[in-house]
Amino acid sequence: WEQRKLGDIADIVGGGTPSTGNQSYWDGDIDWYAPAEIADQIYANSSQKKITGLGYENSSAKMLPPGTVLFTSRAGIGKTAILTRKGCTNQGFQSIVPHRGELDSYFIFSRTEELKRYGELVGAGSTFVEVSGKQMAVMELMMPPTMREQQTIGGFFQQLDHLITLHQRQPFLHSTPEI
């Protein structure tokens, strides 16, 4: 394995919020995530709030591609989810956009606990702790030298997460009365 800086294998992208006082910026069709929406799920499929194209154009929100790993950077540092379709976030994120061919989305998602510990360690702030994009970009990670190895490791954790999800649902399925 080799040591790499996160910023060398991914773009770290912050978010933004359109003015809440302008109704023409809201209730559109562009996904716009807030940290409270990121919990224990693996994938982020659709946000609770949506912004319009006008809201996007008039804010510092950035369009993130599918495969981006959303990373909460304040108020609960270190919650992650993988975007399944393009979307935006508010400023409570420093999202990880993997460079094609250099970083596998599920591999970096599988390192959530390491990302969280790092964010909590380097985060600063007097009102609430926050980790910046620059701080995230210099995070050192031990990485397999090839994308194929990352995908193999990421695939293993993906199967493991799938099994865990199935087992968590199993008691519910067995406790449902027959109709």
Q: Where do the model's predicted regions map?
A:
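Residue-level recognition of specific faces of alpha-helices
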Residues: 32, 92, 111, 127-130, ...
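A short beta-sheet element
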Residues: 28-29, 34-36, 43-113
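Amphipathic alpha-helical segments with low aromatic content
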Residues: 1-2, 146-179
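Non-catalytic DNA-recognition/assembly elements of restriction-modification systems
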Residues: 1-16
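A short glycine-rich beta-alpha junction/loop motif
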Residues: 73, 87-94, 127-149
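Specificity-determining recognition surfaces
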Residues: 18, 23, 111-141
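ATP/adenylate-binding site constellation spanning eukaryotic-like Ser/Thr protein kinases
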Residues: 3, 35, 133-136, 168
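Short acidic/His/Gly/Ser-rich catalytic and metal-binding motifs that mark active-site loops
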Residues: 41-44, 130-131
